[in-house]
Amino acid sequence: VADPSHGESLADPRRRDVAVFAGLAVLVLAVSLLSVGIGAIPIAPSRILDVLMQGGADPALARDSLVILNIRLPRTLLGLMVGAGLAVSGALMQGLFRNPLADPALVGVSAGAGLAAACIIVLGDRLLVAFGLPGPLPYAVLPAAAFCGGLVATLGLYLVATRSGRTSVATMLLAGIALGALSGAMTGLLVYASDDRQLRDLTFWSLGSLGGSTWTKVAATAPAILPVLIAVPFLGRGLNALVLGEAEAFHLGIPVERLKRAAILLVAIAVGAGVAAAGVIGFVGLVVPHTLRLMIGPEHRRLLPASALLGGALLVLADVAARLVVAPAELPIGIVTALVGAPVFLWLLLARTRTLDV
């Protein structure tokens, strides 16, 4: 005779997962409407839907269409993509390092991107003068340099940590810490050599912002982050096996070295594109995956897509707070994520310490 309680026990996790993903989808929608509707010109959700459905063709909606389609909608979409990319990267790094307190910055993307951006901000115009070229530098050079700097830094760490075809995540972690310190020192030298305008630009870049978001930025960021979001769930099975250890995962048929390379590459692309689009934003990649582990467990095939949803919603919500706290001015979004993320990180660290003590 079949045990009905067995079927119910199997169904309960599925119901929980469906409820969590439905809740996250609703959260993303609600936060997006909030972001598009709140600002110097408040716009009701009904008018937002009218503008989106009519594409700005109705003259009565001309002002709202201008605000929504040209300013707030690209900003919201960019925030969703960058937040999703950072959170998914954090989940990948935590799975790869088998440490729930790991962060995407461990592979050097943020350090390399930040240093490259600082070089362009401080030295870009001087290099043009030195070579007798007309200036100023096009703005597109800055995010392009940040993206390339992040990829180069990650490639350097990968080469340092790889010997005889095997990549040591411990070596990569230590090399990443060294790279972060070196990058910080070199950025400090650039800050010392900068003028007032460059110093403001450096400060704003290092703390992150979604200000100035355009459809051009969205179009440049989407081809980098969206393929990563599509690809990462396929790494879920391998990351689940990697929790047992590299040798055990290999004996289970997981191509461990290929998995490491894929995870590092995807993190480099997603974080590099995010830093290029919005500057350096911390704690999203750390807090979101760890929080979701408490809600839906460590199964990466669920954790990775859930991280994308919650990461996007969290960053857009932080952007809303950054716009409102000192309106009509705007806080760098990195300040908001740090103010929220740092206490949460300490709480997670203390909770983990208590668990290990038990």
Regions found by a protein language model. Give the residues of each.
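Alpha-helical transmembrane segments in inner-membrane proteins
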Residues: A2-V358
